[in-house]
Amino acid sequence: MSAADVVRIETLGEGALLLHFGEHIDAACNARVQAAAMRLRRANLAGIVDIVPAYASLLLRFDVLNWQRDSSLASALAAIDSESTDAVEIGRLHEIPVCYGGSHGPDISDLAAHAKLSTDEVIALHCGAEYRVAMLGFAPGFPYLLGLDAALHAPRRASPRTRVPAGSVAIGGAQTGIYPRELPGGWQLIGRTPRVLFDVQRETPALLAPGDRVRFYAIDEKEFNSLLAAQG
């Protein structure tokens, strides 16, 4: 079955299309989205000014003065359908240090109790997986990561916090993520990284991009403070 047969197309005003690849959050669907985004960037189709992948959809923004809807859409679908998802480039691997528990991860004990695990087991499971950045959203640079061990799936907090520190590593449902700056949030906080996830002064402000891979490793408070100080 071709991409044109399975992709649902939604028009968003005069200058954008939203391509729907599925209705559920799963790695296979997101792999199709990432593959489509990669192929469209490679195709360099006239009139496309932005390509924004999400969990199960892909936003295409167009220069309304430089595209013909029918021909441009046909070209886009042909590019999407040109290869299998096996051809997706492997994203960059980021190894992210995390200080787990304590004041940096105030919810880790409750999450461990929910999972019927010790906190050490929670940390081992969280560090033992390789995650894929499915999308950025909620706030600039906030990565939604797929690959969380099912034993760590946990509901969001009943009462969201009004302030979550920058760098907080959290779990919400079947996802894990990192708060790029101080924000309100309702995910379960299990640790904090000293890495800066988003900085407008960098050439590429967001540290992570859709399709990138992430592995976490545990550090202690002393190393956390040292790494934090080293970043100025």
Predicted regions and their residues:
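Glycine-rich active-site loops that engage anionic ligands at enzyme catalytic sites
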Residues: 2-232
